């Protein structure tokens, strides 16, 4: 009987203590605060399981130079401020974020990901990280162009590498869905499989 009473008391006290910890202002909410124990591990584990389960298995567009170039312009417009460009330092915005956004052209990270994994990340974003989902602002083709660019970042043609470090062009604005009607808007809650 004492065991059952202790178990019930524990089931009440642990959530109550957690609740008061959170509302008492002790929880680390600033970007400069240290991690809660296991926070990073659990977040990464949950991300990988969800992405592996839901990511599209094949890309509906081909990894062509034209798609890489379009993806490069979109990347510069929407992603570079946080994720950087080839051979560039972290921006002030990236340095001040938590978790720190990965610098995607630094030789590790997305180049070993399947295009569908990068697409899932672009489509959905990540809660509480500053990484937005682009499903409401870019169309399917645009998101796949960026996903293919990132998945192949270590083997891009010279013209695409040059486009990544060049100032944004007028084409970047024209590629924006606000400037042109999207061919296939992304309206699903999750990307197609």
Which residues fall in each region the model found?
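Detector for the c-type heme attachment site
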Residues: 82-88, 123-124, 135-138, 151
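Short, flexible loop/turn segments with low-complexity composition
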Residues: 159-169
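Periplasmic c-type cytochrome electron-transfer domains
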Residues: 2-69, 93, 113-117, 134-149, ...
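Gly/Gly-Pro-rich "capping" loops immediately C-terminal to redox-active cysteine motifs
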Residues: 68, 72, 84-117, 134
């Amino acid at each position: 009987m004492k065991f059952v009473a202790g178990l019930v008391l524990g089931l009440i006290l642990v959530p109550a203590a957690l609740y008061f910890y959170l509302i008492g202002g002790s929880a680390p909410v600033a970007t400069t605060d240290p991690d809660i124990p296991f926070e990073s591990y659990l977040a990464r584990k949950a991300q990988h399981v969800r992405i592996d389960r839901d990511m599209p298995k094949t890309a509906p567009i081909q990894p062509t130079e034209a798609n890489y170039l379009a993806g490069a312009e979109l990347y510069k417009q929407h992603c570079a401020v946080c994720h950087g460009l080839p051979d560039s330092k972290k921006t002030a915005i990236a340095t001040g974020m938590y978790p720190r956004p990965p610098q995607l052209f630094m030789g590790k990270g997305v180049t070993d990901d399947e295009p569908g994994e990068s697409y899932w990340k672009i489509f959905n974003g990540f809660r509480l990280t500053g990484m937005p989902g682009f499903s409401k602002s870019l169309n399917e083709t645009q998101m796949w162009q960026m996903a293919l660019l990132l998945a192949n970042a270590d083997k891009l043609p010279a013209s695409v590498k040059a486009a990544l470090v060049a100032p944004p062009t007028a084409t970047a604005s024209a590629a924006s869905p606000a400037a042109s009607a999207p061919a296939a808007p992304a309206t699903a809650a999750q990307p197609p499989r």
